[in-house]
Amino acid sequence: MIGTIAVLVIAILVIFAFKKSPSNIPPIVETIPFIGCFYQFAKNPLQLVRNSYDRLGEIFTLHLMGFKMTFVLGPEAQALFFRGTDEELSPKEAYRFVTPVFGKGVVYDSETEIMYEQLRFVKNGLVLSQLKKAVGIIQEETEKYFETKWGDSGEIDLLYEMNKLTILTASRCLMGKSINKSLGQSGQLADLYHELEEGLNPISFFFPNLPLPSFKKRDAARAKVAAIFHSIIQERRRSTDDSVDDVLYTLMNSKYKDGSVLEDEQIVGLMIGLLFAGQHTSSITLTYTIFYLLNNLEYFDETQKDINDIVQKENQGEINFDGLKRMNRLETVIREVLRLHPPLIFLMRKVMTPMEYKGKTIPAGHILAVSPQVGMRLPTVYKNPDSFEPKRFDVEDKTPFSFIAFGGGKHGCPGENFGILQIKTIWTVLSTKYNLEVGPVPPTDFTSLVAGPKGPCMVKYSKKQK
């Protein structure tokens, strides 16, 4: 009996392995029947995608434990992804695995119309007037942090420090001084967000609720963050101070089209998601920016000249929005860092209706994906793609969907301007106050869906003499 079953299983696997697929679907990368290339994907997803591109070209499909993930790479192919309609491509269906972090009824776990209304509320809280006010807040918190935590000299893990500093400054901008009263500069929020980040990895995309240690830590961290944010919301409701105007205020006073207001749990989820999306991008990009600048003194000197001319000479030491916008070299450096090291290695949508690309049909049910990390390092898109050359951005690249670090189309990142502003402000304060010594640019850790430098990223610092 057992022998008969074994023969049947082997026969099914053989049929699976040699079964021909329709000729008009994208070429398939498949190694083991049913399992496919899941092991390679879990171990090093970027290497698998890049190798598949080199072998199969701009469109191909990975078989992953019953999931089919079709990648489109290069500006022309990526246009299919970014220009797809909601009827064709659903971000909501692709990103349900983030529900343990964002929460129920928030963004990707809500109906499509509700999701777009929630995203509109967030954008309303990040308008120009808020960005201008944010500069002073970021400067104040950054200076206070260095004075209380760094002192005159020492050695630190830069990524760890920038994680704490970016979430400290972002949370103050988004939620006001209440967050300081709750946490001060303890770094607790950064540590909790690190646990959330560790709970989003390639395995979580397929099985987000497995009883894994990293997922248990993620869920515990989420509960603690939610409790902190709930207490801040309750304090805000009790307050009689009507001068507060931040993103939290915007969310608490927003209404859906039917006239209903956001529930506190939805506000908490949106704040968690907004901070999560911005914090890891900013801290990773800021860390890499500092390493690249100090390993490329030509660009370091140019950015310092801008800071000296704009901040010190013209504005008598004041950092403001208009001055930061004029720091063009620093902006090109940040964009080049994002091209080389985009924190989000994959962007995904679920295919709802079959889609065509150059004679190939992508069936409904597939996950359609682009990889900023692979797509922005193609030699057909950027000359010397693995080299750090910020001057390539001195002239605007008008090729649609060649630079996709912030996504593209109607699903572009709403916090792009805030993130760049935050990085510029922190670097301006840091480079004005301290001399830094760094080693080579660290490699990237691709074991998480949020890819940052492999730590520790040790940096020596000493306060500049006035």
From Swiss-Prot:
Cited SUPFAM superfamilies: Cytochrome P450
Protein name per UniProt: Probable lanosterol 14-alpha demethylase
Entry's family note: Belongs to the cytochrome P450 family.
Lineage: Eukaryota, Amoebozoa, Evosea, Eumycetozoa, Dictyostelia
Pfam families noted in UniProt: p450 (PF00067)
Organism: Dictyostelium discoideum
Keyword Membrane applies: yes
PROSITE patterns: CYTOCHROME_P450 (PS00086)
Primary site of residence: membrane
